[in-house]
């Protein structure tokens, strides 16, 4: 006989699971697939992203946040029972608020503003990645078109969100000096809202998934939702981390920022050059002792394999020459001493080096990331 038997179907797909087994199967999906495991989130929480990379995350995540009440409204319209509608509509209130200036979307806008965006730019959604839009829209369509059981089961990622929220808040407050508790106020409410919503949805799925096929559909729905979240981070990583290929219609660093940072000097391509500003640079002399102001630090970005200069409101990419100079800026060396050290290191004339680095130092001082 040459025909092959089909592979055996796992036992959990053939029989009706108990409520406890179904819950365990659902939670196992989160343990393996929830987006807290994505490399982008590990970088975000561990403080290894630049400010512009954090901005890209905040901007794209806004579209997801903004469409959550749209998704919930579509589901609400399909609920046949008034009691269920009363319970589910609280989700819409949580995000839209009871009045202007209230709700989760408003708090996410404050987060985006906190990292430098103008409100109008974020609201326009014109800078979000196409993959973000496709993923989020697919989720809205899924909830609108699939069975109520599948639609509700897809929301069960909220079972896992308290863990990622705790990691995110602690990690970002620790590792980014431009992030404050006020910036992350969105997550305060979600620590209580998400478990409440998850408890209701989990109970609904347990009671209404009454056949093996329906249980399988619920499991697949949660898997789909995890894929929606994961895909958004895949797109962010590809565009803004590695290989760093930003699509032509997506946000470019420097766009949509408040007036203080909406200039050429804030783009990642801006080097430590006085040409980046039209104002007259602050002159340095050989006897001056340059130093980094409080809150400004030189850091090696492991993700991009290059040094950056981090300031409270901006991030500068640095070329090798700027890095060599700034490594010697310790608040003790004069400009002439720095030039002498570099001359010995590179077997070059210190006078020529000093003449080269003076305008660079002046440009950095003009950008308020260097002082004397």
UniProtKB/Swiss-Prot annotation:
Keywords: Oxidoreductase, PQQ biosynthesis. Residues 268-280 are annotated as: Linker. It catalyses: 6-(2-amino-2-carboxyethyl)-7,8-dioxo-1,2,3,4,7,8-hexahydroquinoline-2,4-dicarboxylate + 3 O2 = pyrroloquinoline quinone + 2 H2O2 + 2 H2O + H(+). CDD domains: TenA_PqqC. The keyword Oxidoreductase applies. It comes from Methylorubrum extorquens (strain ATCC 14718 / DSM 1338 / JCM 2805 / NCIMB 9133 / AM1). Residues 260-288 are annotated as: Disordered. This is Bifunctional coenzyme PQQ synthesis protein C/D. The gene is pqqCD. The lineage of its organism: Bacteria, Pseudomonadati, Pseudomonadota, Alphaproteobacteria, Hyphomicrobiales. Residues 281-372 are annotated as: PqqD. Pathway: Cofactor biosynthesis; pyrroloquinoline quinone biosynthesis.
């Amino acid at each position: 006989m040459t025909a092959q038997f089909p592979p055996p179907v796992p036992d959990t797909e053939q029989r009706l699971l108990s409520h406890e087994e179904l819950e365990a199967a659902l939670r196992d999906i989160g343990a393996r697939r929830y987006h807290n495991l994505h490399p982008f989130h590990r970088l975000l929480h561990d403080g290894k992203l630049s400010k512009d990379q954090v901005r890209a995350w905040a901007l794209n995540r806004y579209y997801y946040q903004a469409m959550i009440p749209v998704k919930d409204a579509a589901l609400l319209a399909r609920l046949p029972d008034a009691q269920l509608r009363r319970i589910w509509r609280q989700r819409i209130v949580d995000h839209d608020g009871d009045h202007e200036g209230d709700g989760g979307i408003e708090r996410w806008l404050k987060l985006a503003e906190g990292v430098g965006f103008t409100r109008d730019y974020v609201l326009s959604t014109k800078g979000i990645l196409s993959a973000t839009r496709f993923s989020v829209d697919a989720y809205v369509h899924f909830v609108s078109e699939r069975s109520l059981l599948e639609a509700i089961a897809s929301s069960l990622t909220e079972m896992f969100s308290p863990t990622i929220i705790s990691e995110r808040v602690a990690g970002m407050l620790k590792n980014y000096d431009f992030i404050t508790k006020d910036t992350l106020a969105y997550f305060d409410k979600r620590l209580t809202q998400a478990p409440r919503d998850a408890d209701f949805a989990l109970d609904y799925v347990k009671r209404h998934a009454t056949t093996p096929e329906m249980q399988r559909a619920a499991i697949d729905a949660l898997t789909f939702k995890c894929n929606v979240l994961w895909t958004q981070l895949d797109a962010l990583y590809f565009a803004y981390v590695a290989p760093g290929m930003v699509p032509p219609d997506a946000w470019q660093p420097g766009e949509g920022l408040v007036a203080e940072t909406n200039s050429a000097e804030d783009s990642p391509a801006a080097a430590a050059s006085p040409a980046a500003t039209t104002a007259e640079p602050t002159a340095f002399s050989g006897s001056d002792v340059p130093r980094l102001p409080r809150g400004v630090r030189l850091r090696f970005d492991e993700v991009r394999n290059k040094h950056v200069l981090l300031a409270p409101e901006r991030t500068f990419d640095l070329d090798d020459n700027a890095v060599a100079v700034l490594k010697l800026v310790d608040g003790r060396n004069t400009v002439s001493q720095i030039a002498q050290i570099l001359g010995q290191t590179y077997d070059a004339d210190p006078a020529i080096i000093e003449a080269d680095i003076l305008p660079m130092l002046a440009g950095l001082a003009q950008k308020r990331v260097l002082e004397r």
